[in-house]
Structure formats: structure tokens, C-alpha cells
């Protein structure tokens, strides 16, 4: 069954994150687990105090962000709407023997949590949502958090990391997102950098290239590129 799906897998899903989350959680897992130096989670505590807090991690995916946050938090509640991703997250938490992390099925637009029920809300690159829905999940984060709400996004001009100039035919929504967070909701923001090391061209093509497009695959192969530099924007409101 798995072998048949791999054999029929397209060369790329061309920026269709909804397809990635629903049908290829194993590719997302390989992509998100490719090492970053320094990691986002190593840099976040320099911006927001995470220690000893109960954190709702919205859009938890396969659990990588939730388990990383558990190094600092008292408890992490990962919220994920895609069933395939949620299964992997729960398996990963069991495999890690983590007692601090639990996962709930739920949507960023209607969190399965009561008002003021957690100390802090995080959302690590909620890429699936169009800009017009950001207002709703920001309001949901503010509703359930007693303290800070922290979202990680991509600043204008950095979609896809340092290959943003290669990526074309993608709706550029970064400016809209920036306006919503900073102008409408008065979030503070700070940019951080991280280098993602894939080590081999084969690995970067089968993960990054599969996600972002055939043109990117051609570029990666031609340039023998194995590292992507990312610029992330941390938005937070206390």
C-alpha cells in the first residue's frame, strides 16, 4: 500500500501545503526534521519566556514543535486538524516517552480550549491558512491565552527561504500577513535566521523540492545546493 503510493507520487506538489498535510505527512516530517542551526526553538526563549508555562501549540503538525517546546514548558497541548499528522504526532510523543505533551484534534479557527485556559499560545508557521483567516485564529489565540500569543511566520520576500527569487507563480501574501499582525493587532515582531542542512541533493530534492516545485528541483540539481537559509518573523503580543 505504502509502496504503491510512493511509486505514484508526483515529482512535486507545487506549493500545495493542503495536499502535503493531508496526503504526505511523511514528507512533511522529513522536511521539518531536517536539522536547523540554530533552531527556532533555541531562539524563541530569547524573545518570550517559555519556562514553566502551559502552552497550546496550534497547528502542531507531526509534533516536532510541541516536543521541542516541552523542553521549556510545564505542559504542551498540541492542536492539529489533519488526522494523518495527528497520528504521527501521537506516535512520536509515545516514542519519546514525553509526559508533558498531549495532542488534541482541532482547528486554529475554533480551538477546543476554554477561555484563558493556557498560559501561552504558539503557532509555528500556520502555512495552510490564507491571510483573510489570520484574523480569526489570532482572535482564537487571544481568547484561550492568559498570557502571550506567539506566531511564527515568513517576512515579506522570504517565502521558501533564500530561494524565494526562484519561486514564481505563487500568490505573495506576506505583506498582508505583516499588516494584520503589526497594524491591526499591534503585535511586536523580531526576525531570526536559521540554516537548514539537507546534506545531500537527493534529500533536498525529495523534501524541499517536492514541496516547492519542479523549477526549484531543477535549480537545486544544477547548483548542487544542499542548504537553505531561512528568515523567520516572530510575532508576539503579551
Locations of regions flagged by a protein language model:
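Class I SAM-dependent methyltransferase SAM/SAH-binding core
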Residues: 56, 62-110
Amino acid at each position: 500500500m505504502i509502496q504503491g503510493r510512493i511509486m505514484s507520487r508526483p515529482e512535486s506538489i507545487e506549493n500545495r501545503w493542503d495536499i502535503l498535510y493531508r496526503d504526505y505527512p511523511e514528507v512533511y516530517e522529513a522536511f521539518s526534521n531536517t536539522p536547523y542551526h540554530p533552531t527556532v526553538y533555541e531562539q524563541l526563549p530569547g524573545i518570550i519566556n517559555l519556562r514553566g508555562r502551559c502552552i497550546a501549540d496550534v497547528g502542531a503538525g507531526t509534533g516536532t514543535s510541541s516536543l521541542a517546546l516541552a523542553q521549556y514548558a510545564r505542559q504542551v497541548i498540541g492542536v492539529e486538524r489533519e488526522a494523518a499528522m495527528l497520528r504521527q504526532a501521537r506516535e512520536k510523543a509515545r516514542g519519546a516517552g514525553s509526559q508533558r505533551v498531549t495532542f488534541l484534534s482541532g482547528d486554529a479557527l475554533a480551538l477546543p480550549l476554554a477561555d484563558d485556559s493556557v498560559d501561552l499560545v504558539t503557532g509555528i508557521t500556520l502555512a495552510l491558512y490564507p491571510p483573510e483567516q489570520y484574523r480569526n485564529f489570532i482572535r482564537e489565540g487571544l481568547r484561550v491565552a492568559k498570557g502571550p500569543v506567539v506566531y511564527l511566520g515568513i517576512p515579506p520576500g522570504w517565502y521558501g527561504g533564500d530561494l524565494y527569487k526562484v519561486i514564481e507563480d505563487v500568490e505573495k501574501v506576506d505583506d498582508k500577513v505583516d499588516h494584520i499582525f503589526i497594524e491591526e493587532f499591534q503585535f511586536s515582531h523580531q526576525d531570526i535566521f536559521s540554516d537548514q542542512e539537507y546534506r545531500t541533493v537527493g534529500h533536498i530534492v525529495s523534501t524541499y523540492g517536492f514541496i516547492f516545485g519542479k523549477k526549484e528541483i531543477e535549480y537545486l540539481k544544477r547548483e548542487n545546493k544542499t542548504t537553505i537559509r531561512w528568515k523567520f518573523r516572530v510575532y508576539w503580543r503579551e
